Amino acid sequence: MTPAERLRALADADDPLVLPGVYDGLSARLARQAGFDALVVSGYSVSAARLGLPDFGYLSQIEMVDAARDLIAAVPGTPVVVDADTGYGNALSAARTARLLHAAGAAGMILEDQQWPKRCGHMEGKRITDRADWLAKIRAVVDLREEGIDMFLIARTDARGVEGLDEAIARAREAATLGADAVFVEAPVDAAEMRRVAGDLADARPVANMVEGGRTPLMPAPELAALGYRVVLWGITGILAAGHALRGAYAALAATGSGPDPSALMTFDEITDAVGLPDHRRLDERYSG
């Protein structure tokens, strides 16, 4: 079974596939150790952590591929979906992005219909491409399966905030017809819209995106499953938690000249264990003179 096939099986299981957002090797390992079967690389999070910049079109194709490659290597055997933004160009660019991500070990990708430079789907000022342009990108990535480049493709549309929910659902439906594995209508604004998206796209593996502080109401996985969602993204939870913890630790250090209360920190050994030091010690002993 390929990594993409594993994701399809997980998405079709009794419970929805919940994907926590990760952005580096440590976050990926901690999410995996928490018990998640698969992960998603969040563009919002990588842009913040790697560049110190907002999700505003700054993160390049190669920067995202490099970030994905590093964290995928930290969790071997774990299916990872990567936020590929707009595919970084036209249909040919989207196909090249898929090739690069597949070579980096990714099991899937998210491909959206914003114009470049794109921005976070829960920000103002989004612009979307013509439907035909986006669908050409979807088709280009799907066609790679004929070459053995099988990606679990999540087709994301931001049309809800630009042209309305009807257009967003129509775009998602066409993407599914072309072979997208799951469809992602970004930023429905209330429970009624959430129900409609899940109902109208029930046969297309609808995706729910839970963004703390965003436009969409937050719902736990069981409620989303009852509506019919098959994939649930919590893409920025990790970076929000990390940012909060780091800001508090640095503020305490700056204010007191000493670190925060130890109860607010992982221990030295907890971190080294989380990144696999015991395994590396065993390897070192095995290969030492």
Predicted stretch roles:
Residues D143, T237-G289:
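Extended, intrinsically disordered, low-complexity segments
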Residues M1-T2, G289:
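Short, low-complexity, intrinsically disordered N-terminal peptides in bacterial proteins
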Residues T2-W234, L240, G248-A251:
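Alpha/beta enzyme core
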